[in-house]
Curated annotation (Swiss-Prot):
The gene is rplR. InterPro entries: Ribosomal_uL18_bac-type (IPR004389), Ribosomal_uL18_bac/euk (IPR005484). This is one of the proteins that bind and probably mediate the attachment of the 5S RNA into the large ribosomal subunit, where it forms part of the central protuberance. Part of the 50S ribosomal subunit; part of the 5S rRNA/L5/L18/L25 subcomplex. Contacts the 5S and 23S rRNAs. This is Large ribosomal subunit protein uL18. Keywords: Ribonucleoprotein, Ribosomal protein, RNA-binding, rRNA-binding. It holds the Pfam family Ribosomal_L18p. Disulfide bonds: none annotated. HAMAP family: Ribosomal_uL18_B. It comes from Vesicomyosocius okutanii subsp. Calyptogena okutanii (strain HA). GO terms for biological process: translation.
Amino acid sequence: MKFLKKQARLRRATKFRAKHAKKDIERLCIHKTAQHIYAQIISSCGTKILASASTLKAKLKNGGNVDAAVKVGEAIAKAATSVKVKKVAFDRSGFKYHGRVKALADAAREGGLDF
């Protein structure tokens, strides 16, 4: 069952990336595990990481909860403004828009990102 859930998530992620690959816009790509959450802003060509934030940083320990996701969202918004990125496409990597994913997205929007 676990393998089927992962396959379905990866299929959803592939559909999003195929649809947005031709658009000339940066992606805010996230990944979550049971203990951590990661966020990266990837260039429009898909080959360069412009900014990143995760709960692996010393300031953002205890990363398996919604509060840590909010802090990562704020950090990625701050990092994005430092590299002059305002508009992104939110790539949730096939994860449901609920809980930690939603908290990260809301915090990034409040930080100034537009998606």
